[in-house]
Amino acid sequence: VGEGEPLLEKLLLGQSLEGERCFQVGEPPRSGLIHEQPESRPKTACDYSYIASIWPQLDWYLEAGDFYVGVQTKRGCPHNCCYCIYTVVEGKQVRLNPVDEVVAEMRQLYDRGVRGFWFTDAQFIPARRYIEDAKELLRAIKAEGLTGIRWAAYIRADNLDPELAQLMVETGMSYFEIGITSGSQELVRKMRMGYNLRTVLESCRMLAEAGFKDHVSVNYSFNVIDERPETIAKPWRITEN
């Protein structure tokens, strides 16, 4: 739970897990520990040369080239969606990975022929205060000369502005997922999702105006809290708009 790297290191070294945010098989849950904020540690780039040295099949895995390879730019999600476990798994505190380390990891993969990247964050833009951080990363990707790439992410489409939309298109965003979950603003509020459906639609139009013409995956859920026949019909009206 939270940062897995120090936990794995302690397991390998046979050290105590007394202070770690984790469940241990065969032991009763420790009261309160699961809700503590994870310790923030700077994330360094994966060393793919080392990975290749201990896993000879790495290049075989990358040969097809028609898929996305995961790269993480941040951890944590500040939201309270009632159905989601990310706030338990990663914590609500957002921890940004250093931009230069993210780009260095992408450069290693790029030099190995990878052109598809999936940003594995719980949310690529978790809140409006992280818009500038997303811009900084995308500008760094451009400056690194990672041309011809395609990237994808799960985003909250209410956290966009025109400049960010333009950068997303220019750097190769080819696919994104948004979780509208319901076309009913009433049910969105009841699920504590914290966004306005009209703002989401306006942001999608903003991306289209910036030149985005690729794939969008819209996640809907049926039979959510207080679902009714009239609320089930609303997503299709939203899609038509």
Each model region followed by its residue ranges:
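Catalytic cores of alpha/beta
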Residues: L164, D226-T239
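Acidic, low-complexity intrinsically disordered segments
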Residues: V1-E105, D111-R112
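Short, intrinsically disordered, charge-balanced linker/junction segments flanking boundaries
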Residues: G2-G4, L8-L11, V169, L201, ...
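Phosphate/oxyanion-binding loops and surfaces in catalytic or ligand/nucleic-acid-binding neighborhoods
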Residues: G14-E18, P126, N241
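Short, low-complexity, polar/charged sequence segments that are solvent-exposed and flexible
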Residues: E18-G19, E90-G91, L138-R139, E170-M173, ...
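Conserved SAM/AdoMet-binding glycine-rich loop
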Residues: V99-S217, F222-I225
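Donor nucleotide-sugar recognition loop
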Residues: P78, G91-N97, R192-R198, P229-E230
